[in-house]
């Protein structure tokens, strides 16, 4: 059996940069085989896209398990679709089992991804997250899968050195750390 595999670096225009993902357009249905291929690829995610009737179905696998949603592997899949599968297309829609329809639109220079919105709720577990991050966030929220920590200073986020072992003890897939920043708006005169 021969299965073409595309390796794509998302979020970059340079080789060997960005966030790599493997992309496979095929009729595979065997979850165990898909898991073995993802383990062999040994990238954070491998996306499998299958055309069924007029729709594309997508599944994502890490080297160890199937996952519910992956942004960079979806963007990588759209890149392959636009450049190798249907060069005339301007939209790439895929159906995900747990997240419904996901859409990527081709722009002049970028791909635009429309993903489901998470419903973040305030969390009071500041002591635990302070242990993980070494600093206390201004605000902390818990989404379906991730924690969202908000800081008042961009340099705190840039210089953060989380303890990932401690982070694993939280009931979360990951942590999103962001900061408030000040924007300088251009002056427009007529």
Model features per residue range: what roles?
Residues 1-69, 74-183:
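Active-site proximal loop and beta-alpha junction motif in alpha/beta enzyme cores
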Residues 182-190:
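Single conserved hydrophobic/aromatic residue that forms the stacking wall/gate
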């Amino acid at each position: 059996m021969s299965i073409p595999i595309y390796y794509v670096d998302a979020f970059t225009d340079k080789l060997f940069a960005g966030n790599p993902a493997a992309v496979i357009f095929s009729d595979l249905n065997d979850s165990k085989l898909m898991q073995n291929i993802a383990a062999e690829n040994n990238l954070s995610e491998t996306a499998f896209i299958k055309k069924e009737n007029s729709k594309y179905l997508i599944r994502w696998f890490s080297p160890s398990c199937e996952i519910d949603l992956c942004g960079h592997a979806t963007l990588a899949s759209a890149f392959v679709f636009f450049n190798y599968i249907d060069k005339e297309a301007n939209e790439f829609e895929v159906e995900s089992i747990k997240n419904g329809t996901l859409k990527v639109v081709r722009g002049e220079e970028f791909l635009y991804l429309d993903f489901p919105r998470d419903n973040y709720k305030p969390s009071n577990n500041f002591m635990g997250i302070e242990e993980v991050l070494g600093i206390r966030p201004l605000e902390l929220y818990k989404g379906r899968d991730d924690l969202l920590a908000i800081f008042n200073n961009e340099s705190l986020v840039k210089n953060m050195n989380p303890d990932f072992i401690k982070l694993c003890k939280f009931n979360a897939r990951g942590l999103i750390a962001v900061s408030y920043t000040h924007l300088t708006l251009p002056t427009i005169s007529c």
